[in-house]
């Protein structure tokens, strides 16, 4: 259960920038581990006895007092050999595939298909072994603590007559599974299951080449020809729109104020500083006009606050709806009301719903979803595609994560490192590493299995 508890990267960065929050998270994880170990016999007790859940919890808690360290050691004695075998197998096959990639290119694809199949089968067996052993440990403890009656672990299986037809059928089924899996692995390794994702510059910058959400940064980044430049806007005190991400201007401008407290004229007189660059804050009119001159499409995030005017969205649509549609721009927002309003009033304008955490797949009228990459899973992308919706991954700044998200078939990748993203995608298309693809497959599908 603890393996399923994932904190998004942007929250992790926020937490560990504040040491006291980091200590709190570590303490919570340790407490969760302690509870999981302490209550290990509870699951067998709930399954194999007729004791009401509340009484089962109370009895388990009482009987396991003083047994936590012994149980933890037993769990580690199961986990460590499995982890070591998995690591050695993965490293061994990775090195073998790397050798094939560099010295036996004609056999590299066949070798990758076989290696991936072997790795999947062995890891599945190890996972089953670990799960069964963990359950047996819990069952044994439940018996010792008299939470359940003693179990007869030796099942009596009646002998069956294995005639020729049965054997042929079994062999045929195995061959079918192996053949189907091999075709799937081949399609995955050759890129047949994935399309080229859109490249999207986060806040209009690439590797700190300017101040986020400003026109000079837009001009510099547009030279690299991203598919979209993502940017943010807020409503101002006089109900206009300014290009700004933060709800407080202090970090960028030194002014301790919020966008809704200043007029647009006051906002655009402020100077923003970041990454060694200095420039003026831009109105959305100025930024949009600059993007049109550059023929650069935008992905516009509409930021909302409780202080926004009731007519904000109607005003925005009246001013920009048809213009954005003509420019082939797109929108996204964390505010569900923004998404539904845009989809209702400007249905042809693609509008995405931003989700910082993906627990279940939502039912929305959005054109697609902007999903935080930490909790992004292939099953979520597949579900979106089945519903004719797109998925953008945000924010992906590491080349390994870029490869992973691309192989998961995300429709777009939002990044602060546009140059690295374009290089990574080029390498994937023109100089593929089957060894790296095997690792990406394992991490992608293990994430799906956990979710």
Protein language model features and the residues they cover:
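Internal/C-terminal transmembrane anchor helices
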Residues: 155-189
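Selective recognition of hydrophobic, aromatic-rich stretches within alpha-helical transmembrane segments
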Residues: 1, 14-52, 108-145
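Membrane-interface segments at or immediately adjacent to transmembrane helices
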Residues: 186-238, 250-252, 257-261, 266, ...
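Metal-dependent phosphodiesterase/phospholipase catalytic core, i.e.
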Residues: 245-349, 385, 441-450
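Nonpolar helix-loop interface/hinge motif
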Residues: 31-99
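Conserved, mostly hydrophobic/aromatic
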Residues: 202, 221, 232, 267, ...
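C-terminal active-site rim and adjoining tail of enzyme catalytic domains
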Residues: 354-451
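Structural preference for beta-strand elements that scaffold enzyme active sites
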Residues: 196-200, 228-230, 297-299, 328-331, ...
């Amino acid at each position: 259960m603890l393996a399923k508890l994932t904190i998004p990267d942007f929250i992790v960065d926020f937490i560990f920038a504040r040491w006291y929050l980091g200590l709190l998270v570590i303490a919570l994880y340790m407490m969760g581990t302690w509870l999981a170990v302490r209550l290990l016999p509870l699951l067998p007790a709930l399954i194999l006895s007729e004791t009401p859940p509340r009484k089962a919890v109370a009895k388990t808690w009482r009987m396991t007092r003083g047994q936590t360290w012994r149980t933890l050691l037993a769990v580690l004695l199961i986990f460590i050999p499995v982890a070591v075998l998995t690591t050695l197998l993965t490293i061994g096959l990775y090195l073998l595939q790397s050798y094939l990639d560099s010295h036996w290119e004609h056999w590299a694809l066949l070798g990758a298909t076989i290696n991936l199949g072997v790795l999947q089968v062995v890891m599945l067996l190890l996972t089953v072994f670990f799960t069964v052993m963990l359950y047996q440990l819990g069952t044994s403890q439940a018996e010792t603590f008299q939470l359940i009656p003693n179990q007869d672990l030796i099942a009596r299986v009646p002998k069956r007559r294995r005639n020729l037809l049965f054997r042929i059928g079994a062999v045929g089924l195995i061959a079918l599974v192996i053949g189907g899996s091999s075709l799937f692995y081949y399609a995955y390794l050759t890129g047949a299951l994935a399309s080229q994702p859109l490249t999207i510059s986060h806040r209009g910058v690439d590797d700190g080449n300017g101040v986020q959400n400003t026109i000079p940064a837009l001009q510099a980044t547009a030279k690299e020809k991203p598919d979209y430049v993502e940017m943010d806007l807020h409503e101002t005190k006089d109900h206009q729109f300014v290009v700004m991400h933060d709800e407080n201007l202090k970090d960028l401008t030194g002014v301790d104020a919020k966008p809704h407290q200043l007029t647009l004229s006051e906002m655009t007189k402020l100077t923003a500083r970041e990454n060694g660059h200095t420039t003026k804050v831009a109105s959305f009119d100025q930024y949009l006009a600059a993007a049109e001159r550059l023929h650069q499409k935008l992905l516009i995030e509409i930021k909302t606050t409780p202080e926004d005017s009731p007519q904000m969205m109607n005003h925005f649509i009246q001013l920009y709806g048809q213009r954005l549609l003509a420019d082939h721009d797109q929108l996204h927002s964390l505010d569900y009301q923004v998404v539904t309003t845009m989809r209702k009033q400007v249905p042809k304008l693609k509008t995405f719903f931003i989700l910082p955490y993906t627990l279940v797949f939502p039912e929305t009228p959005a054109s697609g979803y902007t999903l935080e990459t930490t909790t992004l899973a292939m099953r979520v992308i597949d579900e979106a595609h089945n519903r004719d919706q797109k998925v953008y991954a945000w924010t992906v700044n590491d080349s390994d994560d870029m490869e992973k998200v691309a192989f998961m078939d995300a429709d777009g990748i939002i990044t602060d490192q546009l140059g690295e993203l374009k290089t990574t995608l080029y390498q994937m298309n023109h100089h593929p590493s089957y060894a790296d693809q095997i690792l990406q497959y394992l991490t992608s599908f293990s994430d799906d299995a956990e979710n």
